[in-house]
């Protein structure tokens, strides 16, 4: 790769000599020959991508530094759901900036995910303690979408027989915007006021409201209870450390943002939202839930619980389309609470509340009218005709306050606010603060009886906290240890140079509603990224707002819906989806108000074009969209893709292109050229944003020219149909993708795609003599991933795909995607970043496992006592005094004899009991009093 800058060669795993050896193994003379065989000529891009030439790491960092230097970072008192924070350095360095945490995948393989599962369990415990509700999920995307998700829970609770939602107080404008977007296709009636009727599914109570005021909701809550409506509290989690828990005053659900628990504003994200519910709602809440179970030896172990609720299983009947959430940020929030403990959290909250109370008192003394009598951190002041002038004066002093309207301003205090700030802000109103520590929060004080669990009291010194985070990280297997060959997940390198800017002050510490002239760096960076993604995909416009791939799907389908409505075709509501589709596809279609019609696939995995044609023609008067993943979820470039698109267009539909497998296309083909009208791009797959152990993700959408007017809007931009709380979604991590594209250039991106395809075909070639490769395209080639049929081991030896997955842990690997899209198989995606040495190690392990299964088939090892059935093996099990197994300890933990013992990964638990964990659901740690 001498023609490329060093970064490209560092990003791509195989060296030049490795590439030649792999091609030789495939019997091919060149990479060009492989691409000609694997990628249909009809879709190939016959020109280079028109992107800026690649830069070195140093030059790209310097250029981005100059761009983001255009941002003017001033101290924000805007509030509206976003607050300044002090991220504890021990958390920033040992968690947020630690690849052991941010390169991990969603913890579906429990045995190699105990560290992050444990911290997410503590996050759920934190939320349950704050809200007084027994069940919390392990994060949602942001506060606005969390409110919408809670409303969805309420409607499902009433079996969709009630559709009216009462907003009982003033929510943040962006929350109302997102709720209205979600309501329209689902037929929710959004009302305001205090009138609860028999059709009301839920009331939404802001606690406090967007003005900072705690209203008197006693009557409307009582009315809701009398009418059977659920009560949803939108509650500030910092305020809840000194206030009565929402469950105490009648909340059935509570939602909010955990951003102020140590997570920077980041110009809007990413941040973890929380959702907690009463026990009766447990099985219909969205998102992932961490539960406690036991392993095969009775040791406590964590796992993802109640997965049958999730979109990948229930599809169009799922409770939500939430897939990727905000695990990394939820873990930061949990660590923040563990670091400070309950007393520390209460000290922060009390100080913030006292600053706000003193500010309110000073304004009142100066004759300024303020909203409400009870408040936590925000003071809303009436300043007839002077709002802009006062805000301008604050700006001159380096502080930003919120202009609510021409006559009203809001000032929100936070953890970073000082006495100097208080004095300066009061002076803008002709006021002078006095001393005191009175707070104005309503109701009973929280007291000391919360977060009594030991973990929130044991890590007061930095030494203890550092070691705590290290111990958790050591339990997990992430990309910093080994290959994660998950099909359809694209676990590629997240380069250090890409990650560094996320922590820059000019990236991390801007409020999303800061004045436009102060965020010109973000404007330039996002404009660059939109243009580059348009060039890569061929589309006319891009929205960066969706903060997960699932939200990109939803945004894209909503753009199609609004397009049809604009042309008087609002009756079009049929969405054709192949039977092989990702589970989010049908879930998103249902959320967008569409009815799903399944298109069959042929035995070779390709879409049945005759079935597609028949169903498109049958529904031609009502056809809205066709959702297709390309390359297919079976890991094959289907030759008929353009014909599929033509059939849909001929029958009045739009083509939605699921970009989950875009890593096989970049630089080789473009969705828009193929015939797609809209496509979402997983920046946390193809474009190097890390998975974070289950989020954050970013799922921007690209659209053809006719759909550009229907891209997501935002209330702050004077438009509608937002799908996320902030205009640019998880804006701060967009710099990762900016850096990746800037350092790779068009030629480097194409080379990465070619390497990904080569790696997958090399794996398929090495394994096909042992395991059938389930689907291949022309010339017996796969795309960037392949499905390995392990059912042959089940047939010959009774060895299940789960046995293989768990045995791979003993070999030092995260298992490939298990039983999807075909039950009993493994789907392997190596990405371009894995070197040949690691790929060979995986292949050697898979071949060795087949050999172990043969020993079971031949009767050498019993079917119920062999290394596969007992996998994974922990150090404590292996060191037990008695060893009664028919295989040796060495065969258990150093299989194949090809491992460096010093590099051995030891799982902390043996196989986790999934069934028992769901039957006996434990998803938070009981308080100390429960053991009395």
Swiss-Prot record:
The keyword Oxidoreductase applies. Coiled coil: none annotated. It catalyses: N(6)-[(R)-lipoyl]-L-lysyl-[glycine-cleavage complex H protein] + glycine + H(+) = N(6)-[(R)-S(8)-aminomethyldihydrolipoyl]-L-lysyl-[glycine-cleavage complex H protein] + CO2. The modification N6-(pyridoxal phosphate)lysine is found at residue 685. GO terms for biological process: glycine decarboxylation via glycine cleavage system. Keywords: Oxidoreductase, Pyridoxal phosphate. It holds the Pfam family GcvP2_C. It is an enzyme of class 1 (oxidoreductase). Transmembrane segments: none annotated. GO terms for molecular function: glycine binding; glycine dehydrogenase (decarboxylating) activity; pyridoxal phosphate binding. GO terms for cellular component: cytosol; glycine cleavage complex. NCBIfam families: gcvP, PRK04366.1. The glycine cleavage system catalyzes the degradation of glycine. The P protein binds the alpha-amino group of glycine through its pyridoxal phosphate cofactor; CO(2) is released and the remaining methylamine moiety is then transferred to the lipoamide cofactor of the H protein. This is Glycine dehydrogenase (decarboxylating). It comes from Brucella suis biovar 1 (strain 1330). The gene is gcvP.
């Amino acid at each position: 790769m001498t023609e490329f800058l060093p970064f490209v060669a560092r990003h791509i795993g195989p060296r030049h000599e490795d590439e030649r050896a792999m091609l030789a193994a495939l019997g091919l003379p060149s990479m060009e020959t492989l691409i000609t065989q694997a990628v249909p000529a009809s879709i190939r891009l016959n020109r280079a991508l028109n992107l800026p030439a690649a830069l070195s790491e140093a030059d790209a960092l310097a250029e981005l530094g100059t761009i983001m230097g255009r941002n003017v970072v001033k101290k924000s008192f805007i509030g509206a759901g976003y607050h300044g924070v002090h991220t504890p350095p021990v958390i920033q360095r040992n968690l947020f900036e630690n690849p052991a945490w941010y390169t991990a995948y969603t913890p579906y393989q429990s045995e190699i995910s105990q560290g992050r599962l444990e911290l997410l369990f503590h996050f759920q415990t934190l939320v349950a303690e704050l809200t007084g509700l027994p069940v919390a999920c392990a994060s949602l995307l942001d506060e606005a979408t969390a409110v919408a998700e809670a409303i969805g829970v309420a409607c499902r609770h009433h079996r969709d027989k009630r559709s009216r939602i009462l907003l009982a107080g003033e929510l943040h404008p962006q929350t109302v915007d997102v709720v209205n977007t979600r309501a329209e296709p689902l037929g929710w009636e959004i009302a305001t006021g205090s009138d609860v009727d028999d059709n009301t599914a839920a009331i939404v109570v802001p606690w406090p409201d967007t003005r900072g005021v705690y209203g008197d909701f006693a009557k409307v809550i009582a009315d809701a209870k009398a009418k059977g409506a659920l009560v949803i509290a939108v509650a500030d989690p910092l305020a809840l450390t000194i206030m009565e828990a929402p469950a105490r005053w009648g909340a059935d659900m509570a939602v909010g943002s955990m951003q102020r628990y140590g997570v920077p504003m980041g110009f809007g994200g990413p941040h973890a939202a929380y959702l907690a519910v009463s026990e009766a709602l447990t099985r219909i809440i969205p998102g992932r839930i961490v539960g406690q179970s036991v392993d095969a030896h009775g040791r406590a172990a964590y796992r993802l619980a109640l997965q049958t609720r999730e979109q990948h299983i229930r599809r169009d009947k799922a409770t939500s389309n939430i897939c990727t959430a905000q695990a990394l940020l939820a873990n930061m929030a949990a660590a923040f609470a563990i670091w400070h403990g309950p007393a520390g959290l209460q000290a922060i909250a009390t100080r913030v509340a006292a600053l706000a109370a003193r500010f309110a008192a000073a304004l009142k003394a100066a004759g300024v009218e303020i909203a409400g009598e009870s408040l936590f951190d925000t003071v809303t002041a009436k300043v007839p005709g002077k709002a802009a002038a006062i805000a301008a004066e604050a700006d001159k002093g380096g502080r930003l306050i919120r202009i609510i309207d021409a006559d009203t301003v809001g000032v929100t205090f936070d953890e970073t606010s000082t006495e100097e700030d208080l004095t300066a802000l009061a002076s803008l109103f002709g006021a002078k603060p006095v001393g005191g520590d009175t707070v104005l929060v309503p109701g009973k004080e929280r007291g000391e009886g919360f977060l009594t669990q030991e973990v929130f009291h044991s890590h007061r010194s930095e030494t203890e906290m550092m070691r705590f985070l290290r111990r958790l990280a050591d339990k997990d297997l992430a990309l910093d240890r080994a290959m994660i060959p998950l099909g359809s997940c694209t676990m590629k390198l997240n380069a250090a140079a890409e990650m560094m800017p996320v922590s820059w002050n000019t990236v991390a510490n801007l409020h999303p509603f800061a004045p436009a002239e102060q965020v010109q760096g973000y404007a330039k960076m996002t404009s660059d990224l939109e243009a580059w993604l348009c060039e890569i995909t061929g589309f006319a416009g891009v929205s960066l707002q969706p903060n997960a791939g699932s939200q990109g799907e939803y945004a894209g389908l909503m753009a199609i819906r609004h397009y049809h409505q604009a042309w008087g075709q609002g009756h079009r509501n049929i969405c054709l989806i192949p039977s092989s589709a990702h589970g989010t596809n049908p879930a998103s279609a249902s959320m967008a108000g569409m009815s799903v019609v399944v298109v069959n696939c042929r035995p070779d995995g390709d879409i049945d074009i005759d079935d597609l044609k028949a169903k498109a023609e049958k529904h031609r008067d009502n056809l809205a969209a066709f959702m297709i993943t390309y390359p297919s979820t079976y890991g094959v470039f289907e030759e008929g893709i353009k014909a599929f698109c033509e059939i849909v267009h001929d029958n009045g539909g739009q083509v939605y292109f699921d970009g989950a497998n875009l890593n096989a296309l970049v630089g080789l083909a473009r969705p828009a050229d193929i015939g797609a009208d809209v496509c979402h791009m997983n920046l946390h797959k193809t474009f190097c944003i890390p998975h974070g152990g289950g989020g954050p993700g970013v799922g921007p959408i690209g659209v053809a020219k006719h759909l550009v007017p229907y891209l997501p809007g935002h209330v702050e931009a004077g438009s509608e149909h937002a799908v996320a709380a902030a205009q640019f979604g998880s804006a701060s991590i967009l710099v990762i993708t900016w850096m990746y594209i800037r350092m790779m250039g068009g030629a480097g991106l194409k080379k990465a795609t070619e390497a990904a395809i080569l790696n997958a075909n090399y794996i398929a070639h090495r394994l096909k003599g042992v395991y059938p490769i389930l689907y291949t395209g022309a010339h017996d080639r796969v795309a960037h991933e392949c499905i390995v049929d392990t059912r042959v081991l089940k047939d010959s030896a009774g060895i299940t795909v789960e046995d293989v997955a768990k045995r791979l842990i003993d070999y030092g690997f995260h298992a490939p995607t298990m039983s999807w899209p075909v039950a009993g198989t493994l789907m392997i995606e190596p990405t371009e970043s894995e070197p040949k040495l690691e790929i060979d190690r995986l292949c050697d392990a898979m071949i060795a496992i087949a050999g172990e299964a043969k020993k079971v088939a031949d009767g050498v090892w019993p079917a119920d006592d062999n290394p596969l059935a007992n996998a994974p093996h922990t150090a404590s099990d292996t060191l037990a005094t008695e060893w009664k197994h028919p295989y040796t300890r060495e065969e258990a933990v150093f299989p194949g004899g090809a491992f460096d013992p010093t590099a051995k990964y030891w799982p902390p638990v043996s196989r986790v009991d999934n069934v028992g964990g769901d039957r006996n659901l434990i998803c938070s740690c009981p308080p100390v009093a429960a053991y009395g």
